[in-house]
Amino acid sequence: METSAMLSIFKETQALLDGHFKLTSGRHSDSYFQCAKVLQHPEHLGTICSAIADHFRESGVDTVISPAIGGIVVGTEVGRQLGVKTIFAERKDGRMTIRRGFSLEKNERVLVVEDVITTGGSVAEVMALVEAAGAEVAGVGCVVDRSNGTVRLADSQFSVISLEVHSWPAESCPLCRNGVPIEAPGSRAASPSPSA
């Protein structure tokens, strides 16, 4: 499916928002991809995840891992389509961990799947967990790459939508300077910006 058609689906389901947002990364932006709004529709979830699964189908993936919360639905569906187990990593005391009885085996080929990549911080943390377990990162897949490909996390990396979306460090955000009210819709609790 072409990027323009995929963006139409995001707009139609109100998953692409315009305004002033504090992103999970801490940066500010004038747009926000709320992937949950599009992924709540099974037909869109299947279409989006099939693009990721198809890209990695011949990569010998044994397991799909996703950072909680946003990546779980996407990772689970990609894993289902690839016919492999799916697990997730989550934050405990501010650090990404593998819990709930999940584990990775030495030399296991692991695909890291996320909903949205802005700076790649959460994905990089999950990749470090995979490598610390002695497993191998088979690639990184995501629904939306907000960096338009400038954030490279793995040799094999794929995004369904790749766009350059404006974002700024909080201290130099033009929307804050103009007094535009800010929202923090991400999955991690975000505190209001002092300049908001």
Swiss-Prot record:
Top EC group: transferase
Chain sites annotated for binding 5-phospho-alpha-D-ribose 1-diphosphate: E114, D115, V116, I117, T118, T119, G120, G121, S122
Keywords, ordered alphabetically: Glycosyltransferase, Magnesium, Pyrimidine biosynthesis, Transferase
Keyword Magnesium: yes
Gene Ontology biological-process annotations: 'de novo' UMP biosynthetic process; pyrimidine nucleobase biosynthetic process
InterPro entries, A to Z: OPRT, Orotate_PRibTrfase_bac, PRibTrfase_dom, PRTase-like
Obligatory cofactor(s): Mg(2+)
Pfam families: Pribosyltran (PF00156)
Pathway(s) this gene product operates in, as recorded in its UniProt entry: Pyrimidine metabolism; UMP biosynthesis via de novo pathway; UMP from orotate: step 1/2
Molecular function as annotated in GO: magnesium ion binding; orotate phosphoribosyltransferase activity
Binding site for orotate: T118, R146
Recorded catalytic activity of this chain's protein: orotidine 5'-phosphate + diphosphate = orotate + 5-phospho-alpha-D-ribose 1-diphosphate
E.C. number(s) listed in UniProt: 2.4.2.10
Alphabetical list of PROSITE patterns matching this protein: PUR_PYR_PR_TRANSFER (PS00103)
Family under the similarity heading: Belongs to the purine/pyrimidine phosphoribosyltransferase family. PyrE subfamily.
Purpose of the protein: Catalyzes the transfer of a ribosyl phosphate group from 5-phosphoribose 1-diphosphate to orotate, leading to the formation of orotidine monophosphate (OMP).
Subunit (UniProt): Homodimer.
Full protein name: Orotate phosphoribosyltransferase
Organism: Chlorobium phaeovibrioides (strain DSM 265 / 1930)
